[in-house]
């Protein structure tokens, strides 16, 4: 496979500048042509723009983007659905002779795409039945049911994690096996390419995250959440749990005063920092990643370094 038809994944923690690097790289590819494929789970949702730092259309420099705004907030985002859709987008871009640039920080989504995971079956009717049961008895009782059926799965899933509890019970019912036995099977790398990782010093990134959080609230995150509540956000299994959105919903439920919103802002910042630690831990385990320092290099140098690594895949 020549470099001209290799995907170029750009991964890394939240707030490191992956989207801007992707745009810079795409512009440098010039005549080859490039299209960007989103790998941020929450940017899949229509209307979730400010809180996910989704690039506005007029900031995308005319470069086609895929896997943005493909779900309503009431729909459940799943790794399996994303994998199928994003892989199809990438193959279509490659078939047209252009370069797919995969950009995001959602760990499972990225790995399932790059490493061709195979997922256990799903059945909407079985899922719906367990979700109804969740609504009737609550996540605590449902988790207790999971513990009776599969103690190992219950030990691995937080008692407050309704989505994973429902999924585990669905898989157990469909397969008749423990949940762990039906875990996604990791296949060989789907494409022969390099993975570019973008990170920077923790102190610098913390400062960026603080500014990013403040900017989201100042640019209208509360109004965005309020509008999405009118479109069913509260009923969304995954969308309502997104960082920033969950905190604002809780603040509005508590009265929506200045103090509640101040706490929501602080909780969003703290939650984002925790998420960054998880991202770093996950991505650092993958020794295929070529890491670039976003704090030590100018944007042009970062783009040059990313393209140099991509063009010289061994």
From Swiss-Prot:
Q: Recorded GO terms, molecular function?
A: ATP binding; tRNA dimethylallyltransferase activity
**What's in the keyword line of the UniProt record?**
ATP-binding, Magnesium, Nucleotide-binding, Transferase, tRNA processing
Asked whether the keyword Phosphoprotein is assigned, the reply is no
Binding sites annotated in the UniProt record for ATP: 12-19
* Residues annotated as binding substrate: 14-19
EC id: 2.5.1.75
A GO biological process of this protein is:
tRNA modification
Flavoprotein as a keyword? no
Q: Which reaction does it catalyse?
A: adenosine(37) in tRNA + dimethylallyl diphosphate = N(6)-dimethylallyladenosine(37) in tRNA + diphosphate
What cofactor is needed?
Mg(2+)
Q: Where is this site: Interaction with substrate tRNA?
A: 106, 127
* Physiological role: Catalyzes the transfer of a dimethylallyl group onto the adenine at position 37 in tRNAs that read codons beginning with uridine, leading to the formation of N6-(dimethylallyl)adenosine (i(6)A).
Q: Spell out the family assignment given in the record's similarity comment.
A: Belongs to the IPP transferase family.
On assembly, the entry states: Monomer.
Name the chain's protein. tRNA dimethylallyltransferase
- State the gene name recorded for this protein: miaA
């Amino acid at each position: 496979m020549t470099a001209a038809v290799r995907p170029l994944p750009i991964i890394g923690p939240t707030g490191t500048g992956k989207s801007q690097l992707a745009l810079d790289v795409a512009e440098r590819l010039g005549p080859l042509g490039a299209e960007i494929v989103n790998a941020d789970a929450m940017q899949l949702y229509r209307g979730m723009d400010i809180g996910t730092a989704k690039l506005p259309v007029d900031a995308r420099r005319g470069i086609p983007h895929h896997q943005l705004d493909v779900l309503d907030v009431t729909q459940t985002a799943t790794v399996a659905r994303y994998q199928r859709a994003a892989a199809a987008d990438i193959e279509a871009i490659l078939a047209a002779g252009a370069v797919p640039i995969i950009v995001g920080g959602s760990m499972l989504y990225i790995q399932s795409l790059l490493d061709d995971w195979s997922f256990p079956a799903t059945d909407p009717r079985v899922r719906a039945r367990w979700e109804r049961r969740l609504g009737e008895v609550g996540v605590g009782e449902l988790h207790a049911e999971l513990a009776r059926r599969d103690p190992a799965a219950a030990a691995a899933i937080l008692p407050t994690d309704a989505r994973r509890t429902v999924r585990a019970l669905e898989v157990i019912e469909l397969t008749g096996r423990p949940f762990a036995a039906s875990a996604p099977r990791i296949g060989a790398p789907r494409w022969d390419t390099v993975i570019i990782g973008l990170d920077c010093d923790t102190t610098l990134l913390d400062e960026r995250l603080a500014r990013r959080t403040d900017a989201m609230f100042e640019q209208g995150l509360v109004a965005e959440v309020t509008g999405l509540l009118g479109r069913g956000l509260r009923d969304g299994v995954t969308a309502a749990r997104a960082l920033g959105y969950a905190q604002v919903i809780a603040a509005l439920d508590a009265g929506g005063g200045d103090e509640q919103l101040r706490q929501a802002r602080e909780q969003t910042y703290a939650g984002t920092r925790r998420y960054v630690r998880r991202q770093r831990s996950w991505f650092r385990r993958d020794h295929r990643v070529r890491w670039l320092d976003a704090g030590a290099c100018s944007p042009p140098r970062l783009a040059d370094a990313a393209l140099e690594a991509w063009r010289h895949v061994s």
